[in-house]
């Protein structure tokens, strides 16, 4: 079991902790598939909603909040039945806008894993306005059920009434809808190919700045992030922050970053290169490889 879970596993009911410990191996990064979730439900003798709330200390253990020292964990349940954990991330000494919220982390985890709809979001503290707006961008966002400790489960519409969202800007394929933007680049570099694939799956209906980041560690592992825009603009999630959140979930240190690539479309109304370099240089002494490509 990873060291970061030792303290929180003691907070769980023993039947649950006994069933969960084998899953918390060196490769665990917050994903529990539907079959494993069913096993945990059976062995813990908890209802699924109770189980998800009980798992929040595990999700919160994925957090890296050096500024606030406030650990927030979130769990997103996808239409597939799988669950995806996420947690807040802050960049030490840097402006707060670089932060990733737990709900963003969990939802981006699900999105990177191929989920096309989130049914439930479970979180240990009430979602802030930023996160409510971020969740509202998703497919059927107003119907996502929010679960909080000692609170009745309620749809997002309860927490964000009279919402402004993608439909107000005539967007018919919101976040988590299948995206496939035609981007092409002649390269045999596996890392650039991976970044290109993720850029083609990014969500940027407002700026058309389709983009992705891939980070490579010294052992050759790669961690990616895609751009996820928001109708309210500010709650958009940048690909570098998503990639750093992915690294954190996998228990990797930013000092292990050996290479960083940003790919973005030349046809976008904005460029993410400045914000991407700021975040990268805050955590690693690596130069950003910036590639601008034309649509196919």
UniProtKB/Swiss-Prot annotation:
A Pfam cross-reference name: dCMP_cyt_deam_2
Binding site for Zn(2+): 101, 128, 131
InterPro entries to which the protein is assigned, alphabetical: APOBEC/CMP_deaminase_Zn-bd, CMP_dCMP_dom, Cyd/dCyd_deaminase_Zn-bd, Cyt/Deoxycyt_deaminase, Cytidine_deaminase-like, Cytidine_deaminase_bacteria
GO BP, one annotated term: cytidine deamination
CDD domains named in the record: cytidine_deaminase (cd01283)
GO molecular-function terms, A-Z: cytidine deaminase activity; identical protein binding; zinc ion binding
Cysteines joined through disulfide linkages: none
EC number: 3.5.4.5
List of residues binding substrate: 88-90
Domain of life: Bacteria
SUPFAM superfamilies hit by this protein: Cytidine deaminase-like
Catalytic residue positions: 103 (proton donor)
Cofactor(s) required for function per UniProt: Zn(2+)
Listed Gene3D superfamilies: Cytidine Deaminase, domain 2
Subunit structure comment from the entry: Homodimer.
PANTHER family hit by this protein: CYTIDINE DEAMINASE
Family: Belongs to the cytidine and deoxycytidylate deaminase family.
Name of protein: Cytidine deaminase
Organism for this UniProt entry: Shewanella woodyi (strain ATCC 51908 / MS32)
Gene responsible for this protein: cdd
């Amino acid at each position: 079991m990873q060291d970061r879970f030792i303290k929180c596993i003691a907070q769980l009911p023993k039947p649950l902790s006994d069933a969960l410990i084998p899953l918390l191996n060196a490769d665990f990064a917050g994903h529990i598939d539907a079959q494993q979730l069913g096993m945990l439900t059976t062995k813990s003798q908890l209802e699924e909603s109770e189980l998800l709330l009980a798992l929040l200390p595990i999700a919160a253990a994925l957090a890296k909040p050096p500024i606030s020292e406030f650990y927030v964990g979130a769990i997103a349940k996808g239409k597939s039945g799988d669950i995806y954990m996420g947690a807040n991330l802050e960049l030490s000494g840097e402006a707060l806008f670089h932060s990733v919220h737990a709900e963003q982390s969990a939802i981006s985890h699900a999105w990177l894993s191929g989920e096309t709809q989130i049914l439930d979001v479970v979180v240990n503290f009430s979602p802030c306005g930023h996160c409510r707006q971020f969740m509202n961008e998703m497919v059927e966002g107003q119907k996502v059920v929010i679960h909080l400790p000692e609170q009745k489960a309620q749809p997002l519409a309860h927490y964000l009434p009279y919402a402004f969202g993608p439909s107000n800007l005539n967007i018919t394929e919101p976040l988590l809808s299948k995206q496939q933007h035609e981007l092409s680049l002649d390269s045999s570099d596996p890392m650039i190919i991976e970044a290109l694939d993720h850029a083609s799956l990014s969500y940027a209906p407002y700026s058309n700045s389709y983009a992705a980041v891939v980070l490579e560690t010294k052992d050759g592992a790669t961690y990616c992030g895609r751009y996820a825009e928001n109708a309210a603009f500010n709650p958009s999630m940048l690909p570098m922050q998503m990639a750093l959140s992915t690294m954190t979930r996998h228990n990797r240190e930013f000092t292990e970053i050996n290479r960083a690539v940003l790919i973005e479309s030349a046809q976008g109304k904005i460029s993410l290169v400045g914000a991407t370099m700021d975040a990268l240089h805050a955590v690693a002494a690596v130069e950003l490889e910036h590639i601008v490509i034309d649509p196919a």
